[in-house]
């Protein structure tokens, strides 16, 4: 048999090595690859139908995968009877199929537990038993093949909690008071082992009856002595039901401090008839059977995974267990190896941390609360949470009556509180943590996104070893975080911070409180620090400190920019100013023309006598160019008076244009309007019109106030409310806006207004519903008075004012200094009037063009035919040239024909004896009538149009005079060129056509 097995293993190893070489399989070379290979975990189901159904449901979940392509198969077996023989046969049937490596059992009696331990040791197959507390019994020496897990809190864990309380109070001598314990001697021994000290008294009350004086007489040993002292400082009550514990505490004499050793739920703890200061403990949440079964399957899977990595051949080749032949080497090797790995396995499961001690005792995470019977503010007895115990660590709340556990150095350990908060600017901000998951500034806080207590406990436990994902780590800072840090420093406590899972302040929904209030009531947090409004509904279920911030409710609206009208671009100046500007422009142009034509140095024929003249149209062009700041080719006046007037007009235009542009931006944006609301009693809120929407934050103090005071208003606004304040502000500022008004705490609204970059938000109306922000704590918390006292000190010392200045000292929106790069953005609708004006200008240009053609084709020929209005040089040089030079364009063709025909002859006289006009002889000569000098114009010789003889002589005389004028002009032009060359003038000389044409004509 052994040789066959060895040969088979050799073949398998060879195949594995070949597979690794050929395919690069990542498995070790000695591990055979068998597709679909599986190992089996058997489950011996409980007899109760309800428990059996729950176990089957837990086993139906997919089993975890194992290394080396292994799978874990779950096999469930139910035994019809629970006698020892049937149970033994059932377990042997469970272990008979091949591949079964371990089993899970649910013993319901002590004989079953003993039988399971015997069979596990005999078959060397690990068995994990899930026990109830009453099934526990002494089984002799523990065996590594039988692991036990207590579903409920085991007695050892309860004793650990009690011993931690005794040591925290520094009680050296205590008394054990037992109500109904099966083996008092074993219990006392167990206490002595845990406390390292035997109790001073042990009172067994199982035979004493409360209906007579026997119970009171038995407890008299614990009463105060004659000297005023007590025999023991504390007494621990164990094994008592709620009713029996009430009877014992009512009959107990005054003196010792009582501890209820049996965990009880909070609602089962009595409050009347008990001595003050009684300490009780209770498990916060008992683990479900499904979670326990899941973790036990995970325990076996974790051990199998570890074994498969170290000894893959034992995990892959488990042998069949035969109860008739228990000497099988393969089974012995696999079972012992798996038992050794089970004893060293620990992981984080659904029940929390899971670990094994002593190779046979399985532990899961336990969490207990410690309560103390106190007096509430009205004097009534009430239970208050004073501490908590988890996985061997006892933590007291600050201000609790219990003493702290002394540290080795003699200093007192700082307790740790769990604080819940809610992000609300500026009281609490959040940002991402750094690459290492730490916060250089602010406090590290978790954002779990859930309100599950087990999940929170697991996350904070993982935070200690740094295994929390970075996505859940946040850095919290703000007004309330600074206040919390100061309180922690003055009250000497540490804290761990997390953000509320549902993001709500808290309201009563379907009989349960949500948000911050729900976390305080469920014991998930010791205090709530944020902008937590104090109101009557919340004060009935949780406690608040004195307010550290006073505020009220307010209404925030958004300003709207009205559209600018078409003529908005003219609004910077009054209509009278526009009329005055254009009237001054035309009047200035007129005076410029008059000064230029009356000056001996003006650009006119009488003045400088050049080819161009300064007319009224030139003056208008110049004045418009100066007014609108455009650079065009325009004629400028040459006389000093005209230039002075031109500069004066430029100064006038500069001042007017500067004033216009300074007011243009504000006018073009348009007016800012907003919803005018006088307050919460405004008719717009109580009788909203169609389309008017307003809301608040869900489950906030503002919603609670409106719901209680104005139910109809709340019915209208609840469908428009937002989950948080930033969401509500975003709905108000969206485009188009989803809200017309937003109601919330005025302190939060004022901050949103101060940081609004667009200056679109403002608060309106009178404040209402004066309230304050306080720190929330569970009812009857001993921290309330201490925190309130320190908050009052902070107000008196000015620390609260410093916090307000730090987080609220913002630049008001109306006085904000804009950056240089920040510009006013205006759309097309702002300049709609200018576009309309441009379109009108295009239409007017068409009319002007039509008028130009009418003047050129109809008016101009009529003026040419007449003798009046021939001199237009002072008004328009173009019109003057058109009247006194060549023919109109319509006569161009006829002029060309006449130029190609016979030479022009002198006109003859008509029959009336008068000379006809000789315009035809010079109609192609483009000339300008310059004013001649008086001496030259004073001759008495007749002109062309004159009557009389001597025409040939006069013509020759004129030609001589023209030649002389040309010579003088040539000399002048040459001299001007020389002067310009000397002065550095780069202007090129005009072509001297007259100078070049003279020799040709001669």
UniProtKB/Swiss-Prot annotation:
Q: Which residues does the record give as D-serine binding sites? A: 533, 538, 701-702, 745
Which residues form each disulfide bond in the chain?
439-475, 445-476
Q: Please tell me where glycine binds in this chain.
A: 531, 533, 538, 701, 745
How does this chain assemble?
Answer: Forms heterotetrameric channels that contain at least two GluN1 subunits and at least a combination of one GluN2 and one GluN3 subunits (in vitro). Forms heterotetrameric channels composed of two GluN1/zeta subunits (GRIN1), and two identical GluN3 subunits (GRIN3A or GRIN3B) (in vitro). Does not form functional homomeric channels.
In the UniProt record, the signal sequence range is 1-24
Annotated TM spans:
575-594, 642-661, 833-848
**Notes on how activity is controlled:** Excitatory glycine receptors are inhibited by D-serine at a concentrion of 100uM.
Q: Where is this region: Disordered?
A: 882-910
Its UniProt entry gives the catalysed reaction(s) as: Ca(2+)(in) = Ca(2+)(out); Na(+)(in) = Na(+)(out)
Task: List GO terms (cellular component aspect).
Answer: endoplasmic reticulum membrane; hippocampal mossy fiber to CA3 synapse; neuronal cell body; neurotransmitter receptor complex; NMDA selective glutamate receptor complex; plasma membrane; postsynaptic density membrane; postsynaptic membrane
Q: Cross-referenced Pfam families, in alphabetical order? A: Lig_chan, Lig_chan-Glu_bd
Keyword terms, alphabetized:
Calcium, Cell membrane, Coiled coil, Disulfide bond, Glycoprotein, Ion channel, Ion transport, Ligand-gated ion channel, Magnesium, Membrane, Postsynaptic cell membrane, Receptor, Signal, Synapse, Transmembrane, Transmembrane helix, Transport
Q: Which residues are glycosylated according to the annotation? A: 69, 212, 344, 451, 465, 786
GO biological process terms held by the UniProt record: calcium ion transmembrane transport; cellular response to glycine; ionotropic glutamate receptor signaling pathway; modulation of chemical synaptic transmission; monoatomic cation transmembrane transport; protein insertion into membrane; regulation of calcium ion transport; regulation of synaptic plasticity
Membrane topology qualifier: Multi-pass membrane protein
Q: Which portions of the chain have biased composition (kind: Basic and acidic residues)?
A: 891-906
Report the function annotation for this chain.
Component of a non-conventional N-methyl-D-aspartate (NMDA) receptors (NMDARs) that function as heterotetrameric, ligand-gated cation channels with low calcium permeability and low voltage-dependent block by Mg(2+). Forms glutamatergic receptor complexes with GluN1 and GluN2 subunits which are activated by glycine binding to the GluN1 and GluN3 subunits and L-glutamate binding to GluN2 subunits. Forms excitatory glycinergic receptor complexes with GluN1 alone which are activated by glycine binding to the GluN1 and GluN3 subunits.
Annotated coiled-coil positions are 944-985
**Tissue specificity as recorded in UniProt:** Expressed in the hippocampus, the corpus callosum, in the facial and trigeminal nuclei of the brainstem and the ventral horn of the spinal cord.
Give the family, as the similarity comment puts it: Belongs to the glutamate-gated ion channel (TC 1.A.10.1) family. NR3B/GRIN3B subfamily.
Which residue intervals are topologically Extracellular? Answer: 25-574, 662-832
Tell me if Calcium is a UniProt keyword of this record.
yes
What is the recorded name of this protein? Glutamate receptor ionotropic, NMDA 3B
> Cytoplasmic side: which ranges?
595-615, 628-641, 849-1002
């Amino acid at each position: 048999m052994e040789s066959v097995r060895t040969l088979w293993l050799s073949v398998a190893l060879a195949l594995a090595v070949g597979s690794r070489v050929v395919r690069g399989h990542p498995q070790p070379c000695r591990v055979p690859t068998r597709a679909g290979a599986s190992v089996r975990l058997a489950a011996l189901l409980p007899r109760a139908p309800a428990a059996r159904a729950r176990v089957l449901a837990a086993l139906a979940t997919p089993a975890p995968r194992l290394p080396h392509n292994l799978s874990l198969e779950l096999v469930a077996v139910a035994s019809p009877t629970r006698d020892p023989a049937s149970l033994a046969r059932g377990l042997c049937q469970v272990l008979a199929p091949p591949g079964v490596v371990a089993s899970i059992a649910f013993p319901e009696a002590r004989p079953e537990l003993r039988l399971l331990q015997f069979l596990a040791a005999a078959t060397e197959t690990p068995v994990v038993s899930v026990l109830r507390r009453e099934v526990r019994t002494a089984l002799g020496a523990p065996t590594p093949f039988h692991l036990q897990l207590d579903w409920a809190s085991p007695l050892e864990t309860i004793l650990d909690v009690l011993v931690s309380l005794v040591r925290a109070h520094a009680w050296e001598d205590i008394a054990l008071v037992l109500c109904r314990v099966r083996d008092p001697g074993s219990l006392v021994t167990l206490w002595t082992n845990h406390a390292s000290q035997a109790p001073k008294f042990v009172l067994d009350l199982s035979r004493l009856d409360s209906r007579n004086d026997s119970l009171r007489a038995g407890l008299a040993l614990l009463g105060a002595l004659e000297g005023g002292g007590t025999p023991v400082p504390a007494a621990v009550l164990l094994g008592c039901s709620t009713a029996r514990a009430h009877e014992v505490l009512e009959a107990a004499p005054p003196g010792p401090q009582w501890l209820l050793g049996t965990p009880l739920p909070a609602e089962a703890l009595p409050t009347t008839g008990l001595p003050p200061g009684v300490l009780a403990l209770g498990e916060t949440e008992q683990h479900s059977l499904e979670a326990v079964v899941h973790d036990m399957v995970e325990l076996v899977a974790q051990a199998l995974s570890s074994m498969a990595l170290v000894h893959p051949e034992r995990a892959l080749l488990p042998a069949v267990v035969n109860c008739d032949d228990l000497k099988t080497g393969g089974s012995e090797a696999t079972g012992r190896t798996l038992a050794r790995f089970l004893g060293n396995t620990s992981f984080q499961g659904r029940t929390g941390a899971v670990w094994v001690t002593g190779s046979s005792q399985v532990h899961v995470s336990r969490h207990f609360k410690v309560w103390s019977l106190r007096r509430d503010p009205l004097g009534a007895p009430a239970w208050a949470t004073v501490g908590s115990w988890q996985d061997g660590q006892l933590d007291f709340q600050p201000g609790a009556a219990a003493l702290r556990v002394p540290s080795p150095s003699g200093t007192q350990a700082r307790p740790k509180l769990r604080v819940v908060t809610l992000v609300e600017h500026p009281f609490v901000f959040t940002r991402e943590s750094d690459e290492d998951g730490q916060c250089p500034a602010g406090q590290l806080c978790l954002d779990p996104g859930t309100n599950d207590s087990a999940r929170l406990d697991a996350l904070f436990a993982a935070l200690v070893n740094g295994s929390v994902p970075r996505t859940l780590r946040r850095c919290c800072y703000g007004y309330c975080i600074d206040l919390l840090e100061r309180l922690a420093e003055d009250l000497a406590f540490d804290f761990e911070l997390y953000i509320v899972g549902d993001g709500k302040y808290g309201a009563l929904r379907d009989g349960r409180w949500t948000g911050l209030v729900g976390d305080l009531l469920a014991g998930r947090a010791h205090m709530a620090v944020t902008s937590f409004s104090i109101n009557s509904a919340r004060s009935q279920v949780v406690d608040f400190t004195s307010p550290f911030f006073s505020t009220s409710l307010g209404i925030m609206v958004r300003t709207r920019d009205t559209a600018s009208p078409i003529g908005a671009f003219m609004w910077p100046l009054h209509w009278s100013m526009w009329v005055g500007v254009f009237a001054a422009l035309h009047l200035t142009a007129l005076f410029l023309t008059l000064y230029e034509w009356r000056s001996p140095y003006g650009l006119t024929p009488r003045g400088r006598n050049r080819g161009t003249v300064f007319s009224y149209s030139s003056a208008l062009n110049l004045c418009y160019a100066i007014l609108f700041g455009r650079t065009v080719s325009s004629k400028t006046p040459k006389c000093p008076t005209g230039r002075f007037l031109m500069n004066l007009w430029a100064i006038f235009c500069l001042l007017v244009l500067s004033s216009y542009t300074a007011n243009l931006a504000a006018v073009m944006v348009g007016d800012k309007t907003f919803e005018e609301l006088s307050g919460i009693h405004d008719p717009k809120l109580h009788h909203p019109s169609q389309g008017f929407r307003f809301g608040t934050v869900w489950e906030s103090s503002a919603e609670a106030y409106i719901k209680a005071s104005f139910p109809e208003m709340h019915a209208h606004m609840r469908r428009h409310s937002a989950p948080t304040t930033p969401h509500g502000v975003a709905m108000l500022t969206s485009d188009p806006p989803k809200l017309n008004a937003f109601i919330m705490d005025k302190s939060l609204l004022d901050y949103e207004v101060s940081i609004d970059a667009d200056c679109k938000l403002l608060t309106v109306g009178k404040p209402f519903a004066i309230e304050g922000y306080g720190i929330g704590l569970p009812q009857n918390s001993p921290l309330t008075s201490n925190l309130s006292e320190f908050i009052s000190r902070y107000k008196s010392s000015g620390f609260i004012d410093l916090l307000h200045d730090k987080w609220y000292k913002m630049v008001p929106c109306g006085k904000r200094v804009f950056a240089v790069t920040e510009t006013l953005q205006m759309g097309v609708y702002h300049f709609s009037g200018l576009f309309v004006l441009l379109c009108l200008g295009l239409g007017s240009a068409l009319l002007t063009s039509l008028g130009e053609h009418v003047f050129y084709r109809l008016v101009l020929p009529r003026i040419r035919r007449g003798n009046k209005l021939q001199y237009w040089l002072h008004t328009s040089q173009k019109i003057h040239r058109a009247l006194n030079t060549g023919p109109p364009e319509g006569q161009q063709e006829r002029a060309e024909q006449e130029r190609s025909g016979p030479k022009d002859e002198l006109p003859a006289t008509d029959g009336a004896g008068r000379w006809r006009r000789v315009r035809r002889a010079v109609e192609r000569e483009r000339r300008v009538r310059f004013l001649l000098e008086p001496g030259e114009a004073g001759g008495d010789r007749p002109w062309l149009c004159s009557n009389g003889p001597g025409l040939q002589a006069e013509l020759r005389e004129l030609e001589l005079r023209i030649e002389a004028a040309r010579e003088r002009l040539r000399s002048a032009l040459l001299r001007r060129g020389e002067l310009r060359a000397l002065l550095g003038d780069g202007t090129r000389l005009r072509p001297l056509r007259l100078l070049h044409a003279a020799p040709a004509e001669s």
